[in-house]
């Protein structure tokens, strides 16, 4: 094939609607457990949805450098489309054909790539468009793919677009409900339960949406009503991993930690390489320690050994999470709700000394900025912390965070010292040592929590040694800023 033809392919391929043009992953970086989760869904999903997952799996295989395996996944997708959507096979195959063209292009098999480009062109010509068409099922295909890759805002747009053409389509409605649920953590995007209820009405067998409705009702202080939906979903889909995982989250929030651990462990049986699940189980064990401390059980005879055992379980699962590839920054993010509950309510207590309030305002500010939950809330707490300290130097630090971090010149009482050390160990490949540093950083943040939860992460001597540091009122950088700074060292 001539160079001219190769150049023409390079102009055409970006016009194809498929995984290679949807910008699914930042810098083509895929989380280690995504392939496991996609394979799990292929095993448990209804046949009509499997083609979507095979297409995504093909793209993941390509990113891993395994293009032959990618082609096999595309063959599976093509066969399933022919079986399940024979009357719409050509249109439903457009995404698969686009993926074929891209994979063959990367393999250097340009004539094969051209064959699939021509297939797309022949189908799209019927709709007066050379290489792409507007079609609700294609929007839905992209929506499910974006959703699986964590791009919830884009998924929402895709499902909304599909519903404009077919407003009562059960699949489109379920997709929109799931996308909106995942966006619900952002205050400006909160929604009513009507979207989830409509999805259940149109798809009464979709047990995952029922669990999401249960979680939403729990947030609205209607836990008993929500639990009915969760129990029904577990009864009807006892092996569906997304149902089990979300139900575990419900029971963790409820405080039924043993039930949550049981459900998370059942999910691990199907996806044993999912570091996030190990992390969640570790958090449950930490919460069990907190429960015992809050009720005074930790002082009872024989319970000290149990406390130590629970702490060890928590540490073991946290370390296992890192061994399985969980990014420590993600673990830090997942603890946001836990951290806020434990020690970020300090600024609202009028009896707390001003110095302590100022520290807490700043930590709350950093946490909000990192999670992206609310810039307004972050700014508010940052300014309130400043007004308490009345120090111009602190104002400058919040207004303009430092852009460089000195290598290994920081004293141990410097802000976020252990967090930076953890990043360094992680970059050097020493995940276990990184985990220990992150635990100490969490302990530093939680040291003055009323429940004493900081003792999970720090020894008694470290708790005492750090008291002076906590009283200095130093302004800490947020995790995102620290990551940016650490990358500048390399």
Swiss-Prot record:
Tissue specificity as recorded in UniProt: Expression significantly higher in peripheral blood mononuclear cells (PBMCs) and monocytes from systemic lupus erythematosus (SLE) patients than in those from healthy individuals (at protein level). Spleen, lung, leukocytes, lymph nodes, placenta, bone marrow and fetal liver.
Annotated S-S bridges: none
Spans annotated as Disordered: 467-490
Stated induction or repression of this protein's expression: By type I interferons, dsRNAs and viruses.
Gene3D superfamilies documented for this protein: Tetratricopeptide repeat domain
GO CC terms of this entry: cytoplasm; cytosol; mitochondrion
Nucleotide-binding as UniProt keyword: no
Main localization of the protein described in the UniProt heading: cytoplasm
Compartments, record wording: Cytoplasm; Mitochondrion
Residue stretches of biased makeup (Polar residues): 474-490
Keywords per UniProt: Antiviral defense, Cytoplasm, Immunity, Innate immunity, Mitochondrion, Phosphoprotein, Repeat, TPR repeat
Gene Ontology molecular function: any one: identical protein binding
Chain's role: IFN-induced antiviral protein which acts as an inhibitor of cellular as well as viral processes, cell migration, proliferation, signaling, and viral replication. Enhances MAVS-mediated host antiviral responses by serving as an adapter bridging TBK1 to MAVS which leads to the activation of TBK1 and phosphorylation of IRF3 and phosphorylated IRF3 translocates into nucleus to promote antiviral gene transcription. Exhibits an antiproliferative activity via the up-regulation of cell cycle negative regulators CDKN1A/p21 and CDKN1B/p27.
Protein's UniProt name: Interferon-induced protein with tetratricopeptide repeats 3
Organism: Homo sapiens
Gene name, Swiss-Prot/TrEMBL: IFIT3
């Amino acid at each position: 094939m001539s160079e001219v033809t190769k150049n023409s392919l390079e102009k055409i391929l970006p016009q194809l609607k498929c995984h290679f043009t949807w910008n699914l992953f930042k810098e083509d970086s895929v989380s280690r457990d995504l392939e496991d989760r996609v394979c799990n869904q292929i095993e448990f999903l209804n046949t009509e949805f499997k083609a979507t997952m095979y297409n995504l799996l093909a793209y993941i295989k390509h990113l891993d450098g395994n293009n032959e395996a990618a082609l096999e996944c595309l063959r599976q997708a093509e066969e399933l489309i022919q079986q399940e959507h024979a009357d719409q096979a050509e249109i439903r195959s457009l995404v698969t054909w686009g993926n074929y063209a891209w994979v063959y292009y990367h393999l250097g098999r340009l004539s094969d790539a051209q064959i699939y480009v021509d297939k797309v062109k022949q189908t799209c010509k019927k709709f007066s468009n050379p290489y792409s068409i507007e079609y609700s099922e294609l929007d839905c295909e992209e929506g499910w793919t974006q959703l699986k890759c964590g791009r919830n805002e884009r998924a929402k747009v895709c499902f909304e677009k599909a519903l404009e053409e077919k407003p009562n389509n059960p699949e489109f409605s379920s997709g929109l409900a799931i996308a909106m649920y995942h966006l619900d953590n952002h205050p400006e995007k909160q929604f009513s339960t009507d979207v989830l209820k409509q999805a259940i009405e149109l798809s009464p067998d979709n047990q995952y949406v029922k669990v999401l409705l249960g979680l939403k009702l729990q947030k609205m202080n209607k836990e008993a009503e929500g639990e009915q939906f969760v129990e029904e979903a577990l009864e009807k889909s006892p092996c569906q991993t997304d149902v089990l995982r979300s139900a575990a989250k419900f029971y963790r929030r409820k405080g039924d930690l043993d039930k949550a651990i049981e459900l998370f462990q059942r999910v691990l049986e199907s996806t044993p390489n999912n570091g996030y699940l190990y992390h969640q189980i570790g958090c449950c064990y930490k919460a069990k320690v907190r429960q015992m401390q809050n009720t005074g059980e930790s002082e009872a005879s024989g319970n000290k050994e149990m406390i130590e055992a629970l702490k060890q379980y928590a540490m073991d699962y946290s370390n296992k999470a890192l061994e399985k590839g969980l990014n420590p920054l993600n673990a830090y993010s997942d603890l946001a709700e836990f951290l806020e509950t434990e020690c970020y309510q300090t600024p609202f207590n009028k009896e707390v000394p001003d110095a302590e309030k100022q520290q807490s305002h700043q930590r709350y500010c950093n946490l909000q900025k990192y999670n992206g939950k609310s810039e307004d809330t972050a700014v508010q707490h940052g300014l309130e912390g400043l007004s308490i300290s009345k120090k111009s130097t602190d104002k400058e630090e919040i207004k303009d965070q430092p852009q460089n971090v000195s290598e290994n010149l920081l004293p141990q009482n410097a802000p976020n010292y252990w967090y930076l050390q953890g990043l360094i160990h992680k970059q050097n490949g020493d995940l276990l040592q990184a985990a220990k540093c992150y635990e100490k950083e969490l302990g530093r943040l939680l040291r003055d929590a009323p429940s004493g939860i900081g003792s999970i992460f720090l020894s008694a001597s470290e708790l005492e040694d750090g008291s002076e540091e906590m009283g200095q009122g130093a302004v800490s950088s947020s995790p995102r800023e620290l990551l940016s700074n650490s990358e500048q060292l390399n």
